[in-house]
């Protein structure tokens, strides 16, 4: 089973990594093509394209300018440890052990607007490029066109390498839309996390994002390889709802946030 999650806007390059092991992103030719195009944009154009403040636009213009295809621990950090935000708060990668990182490297992937698909230990230089960015390029009108069926093909290969065909989707709609299901040779399992609010179970963004991270961690630590085992997930008060679930769409409820 392979799990996919979204990246995060918030990055941490200040905290020393808890593991020295690292690998290189596998699709850097594509990343470099995007970087070369992004370097042609002024900070004002970046601000308009990405809906960023002038300060953030300037920061990311500088990031694009300093990006290099030569990745080292001095200019990059393992993706799973560099990303912050709600999903990664739930995942809490800093407290994983070396055996956990080994398992995650084979069973977890992060979708990325710039890198396409990242493994946990892949070194990543800092960037901001949301998958939904309407950056016209040589392959089409946006990043979905740029990546085309590539991400699906890479996921197919990762699944084939482990002799499986189950893809656990814990990514946002924006990012999972980059996975072309028509090209995917996998059974996709979708998951919703709902919290009780005003007498109804609803998807509350902050809690749902954190829960995606918690389930990712659960899969890693419990070495889950069968979707049926996902129903055991009970972290921080969530429980499986057979009434609301379908075979390929699991729903977890929580009555009180912890």
Curated annotation (Swiss-Prot):
Entry GO terms, CC: cytosol
GO biological process: response to hydroperoxide
InterPro entries for the chain: YaaA (IPR005583)
Superkingdom in the source lineage: Bacteria
Transmembrane regions: none
Entry similarity comment: Belongs to the UPF0246 family.
Official protein name in the record: UPF0246 protein PSEEN4534
């Amino acid at each position: 089973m392979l799990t996919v999650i979204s990246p995060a806007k918030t990055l941490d390059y200040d905290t020393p990594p808890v593991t020295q092991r690292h690998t290189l992103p596998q699709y850097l030719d594509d990343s470099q093509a995007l970087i070369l195009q992004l370097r042609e944009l002024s900070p004002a154009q970046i601000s308009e394209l990405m809906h960023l403040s002038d300060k953030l636009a300037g920061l990311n213009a500088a990031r694009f300018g300093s990006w290099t295809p030569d990745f080292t621990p001095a200019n990059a950090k393992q993706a799973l440890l560099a990303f912050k935000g709600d999903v990664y708060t739930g995942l809490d990668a800093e407290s994983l052990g070396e055996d956990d990182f080994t398992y995650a490297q084979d069973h977890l992937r992060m979708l990325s607007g710039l890198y396409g698909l990242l493994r946990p230990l892949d070194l990543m230089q800092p960037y901001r490029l949301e998958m939904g960015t309407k950056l016209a390029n040589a392959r089409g009108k946006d990043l979905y066109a740029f990546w085309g069926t590539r991400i699906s093909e890479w996921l197919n290969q990762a699944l084939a390498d482990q002799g499986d065909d189950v893809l656990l989707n814990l990514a946002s709609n924006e990012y999972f839309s980059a996975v072309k299901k028509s090209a995917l040779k996998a059974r996709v399992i979708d998951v919703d996390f709902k919290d009780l609010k005003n007498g109804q179970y609803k998807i509350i963004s902050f809690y749902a994002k954190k829960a995606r991270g918690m389930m990712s961690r659960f899969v890693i630590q419990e070495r889950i390889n069968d979707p049926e085992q996902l129903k055991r997930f009970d972290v921080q008060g969530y429980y499986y709802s057979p009434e609301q679930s379908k075979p390929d769409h699991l729903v977890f409820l929580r009555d009180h946030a912890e």
